[in-house]
Design a protein with these regions (language model features):
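Small-residue-enriched hydrophobic alpha-helices in membranes
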Residues: 1-38, 48-154
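Short acidic, Gly/Ser-rich segments with clustered Asp/Glu that frequently serve as metal-coordination loops
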Residues: 41-45
């Protein structure tokens, strides 16, 4: 599994300037992508708009090309199949992201959840659960939700 990940990152993700941070950054990209995919699947109805929003979020957040983002998402889907829960991904986020970056992940999850203009109870539960797992305070969880609703004019 580690070998497949190393092949993936060497082929599709630009290396960072500091060698020791490479794996960390790549793992964070994978963890974030996996959570976004899980959010897209949370309401059991995956729309084209949700797929586009996930792709756009990954491209923007990590400054990746469409090809790199597509490869990252494909690899993340494979990792999700092997995962037993969110902990595998949230533990990486806890280790590698600042508090502000964690709040941004929650905001990204809300963006995916609201893409179809409807918030399913399973989507809200997932965002709440991830926020708890990455230690985002309730006020920041709510503020992220309100920012996204305002941005999307809901």
């Amino acid at each position: 599994m580690v070998t497949a990940f190393n092949k993936f990152v060497k082929k599709y993700i630009k290396p960072s300037a500091v060698g020791s941070d490479e794996v960390s950054e790549r793992s964070l990209q994978l963890a974030t992508a996996a959570l976004l995919i899980e959010m897209m699947r949370a309401d059991a109805e995956i729309t084209g708009d949700e797929r586009r929003m996930v792709m756009s979020t990954i491209m923007t957040r990590f400054h990746l090309t469409e090809e790199e983002s597509g490869a990252l998402l494909q690899f993340a889907e494979e990792k999700i199949r092997d995962a037993t829960g969110y902990y595998e991904f949230t533990s990486l986020i806890n280790k590698g992201f600042t508090y502000e970056q964690k709040v941004r992940v929650i905001e990204n999850l809300w963006e995916i959840a609201f893409t179809d203009k409807y918030l399913d109870k399973h989507e809200e539960h997932m965002v709440r659960r991830v926020a708890d797992l990455i230690y985002v305070e309730h006020k920041d969880f709510i503020n992220a939700k309100l920012r996204v609703k305002k941005k999307l004019i809901l």
